[in-house]
Amino acid sequence: LTAYVPQDGVAGGKKRTYPLINEKQTVLSSIGTIDFRHILAAKNEMENWRFLRFNPEHLRQPTSKYTGADKLTPSGLNLAAVLYRIKQEDEYSLIEISRELNRFIPEFTGVDVIDDVEHNQYVIYLQQRDGKIFSSRVLSEGTLRLLALCIIEYDNKVKGIICYEEPENGIHPFRI
């Protein structure tokens, strides 16, 4: 078995041959030149695909300021730091994130993140319609997952396709 990859736009141009028996990597991963620009473009696009598998324990955690990380990991680590960065860039985004979450969970009317200077961490808080405030540490798995997806929507560092298996996981059936 062999794969043949012709050069883009050139009749009789370069052609690469890839034997597929006992191959350890994909053909796509081995192409890195402009001679195959369409394949290179597809490869570059696919490198921006993000596969998320949120771990509720990671979503609950405040983000330590010592890590310096403000990019969401596939498991959900750094969610508070991501929200803090978004708040610093455009505080109005918190209102938009709050509205988006409220569309799915009407009980919650506000989303905020604080800089807990005493503990050197960022902590997420949600406010209910009755004024009660809850830390991310006590929120349900479904609420945390929906909150993370709402935050991702307003994160300008997220590019490409988001792949998220079973988005309804942990969400009450009446919310779907």
Model-derived segments and their meaning:
Residues 100, 107-176:
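Switch/communication elements of ASCE P-loop NTPase nucleotide-binding domains
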Residues 42, 101-102:
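Broad structural signal for hydrophobic residues in well-ordered alpha-helices, predominantly aliphatic
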Residues 1-95:
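Electropositive, glycine-dotted interaction segments
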